[in-house]
């Protein structure tokens, strides 16, 4: 059910970091309530890309996506970016009104750059703000290093795993880093 206070978490895996030359190869989405309780998760979509594009990935992406099996899943997938964009829009619209949720995740600006180019309707459904866990990570490193060091990262580089890890990391910062005050009912 739609709720303007729900949060939409997203992660993408790409063939590289440049949206002008690289492409999205995996994406997943999770909806939480404002207290970070998971309400729903989308399917994990591997998006078909050409062999030429996959064969030209840099060393890190070739090794990482090869190790996780993503490269093979992408080769075998029949999903297009447009098809996945529509499926994610349909999923998201069940839970969050248009432009109500910030885009949530880790280093989410990078995902947004790719979304602007390859999934613009989905990007436009989000609020223009980002809820980026990496901002809290950078602040904790500088202002409270023990809190930053106590975060355990698995770094699987699988979209769904990375989202769950981002939500867990946000819970950690909420509990150990952010000042806790009595919560007023959201208006």
Curated annotation (Swiss-Prot):
One of its GO terms (molecular function) is 3'-5'-RNA exonuclease activity. Transmembrane segments: none annotated. Its EC number is 3.1.15.-. Residues 7-170 form the Exonuclease domain. Belongs to the oligoribonuclease family. The gene is orn. This is Oligoribonuclease. The lineage of its organism: Bacteria, Pseudomonadati, Pseudomonadota, Betaproteobacteria, Neisseriales. SMART domains: EXOIII (SM00479). It comes from Neisseria meningitidis serogroup A / serotype 4A (strain DSM 15465 / Z2491). The active site is at residue 128.
């Amino acid at each position: 059910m739609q709720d303007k206070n729900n949060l939409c978490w997203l992660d993408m895996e790409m063939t590289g970091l440049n949206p002008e030359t690289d492409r999205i190869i995996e994406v997943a989405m999770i909806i939480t309530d404002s207290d970070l309780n998971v309400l729903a998760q989308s399917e994990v979509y591997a998006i078909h890309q050409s062999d030429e594009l996959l064969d030209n990935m840099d060393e890190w992406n070739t090794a990482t996506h090869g190790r996780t099996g993503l490269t093979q899943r992408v080769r075998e997938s029949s999903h297009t970016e447009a098809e996945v964009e529509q499926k994610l829009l349909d999923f998201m619209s069940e839970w969050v009104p248009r432009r109500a949720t910030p885009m949530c995740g880790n280093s989410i600006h990078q995902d947004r750059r790719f979304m602007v180019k390859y999934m613009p309707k989905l990007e436009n459904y989000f609020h223009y703000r980002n809820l980026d866990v990496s901002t809290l990570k950078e602040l904790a490193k500088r202002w409270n290093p023990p809190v930053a060091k106590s975060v355990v990262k698995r770094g699987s580089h699988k979209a769904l795993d990375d989202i769950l890890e981002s939500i867990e990391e946000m819970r950690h910062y909420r509990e150990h880093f952010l000042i806790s005050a009595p919560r007023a009912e959201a208006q």
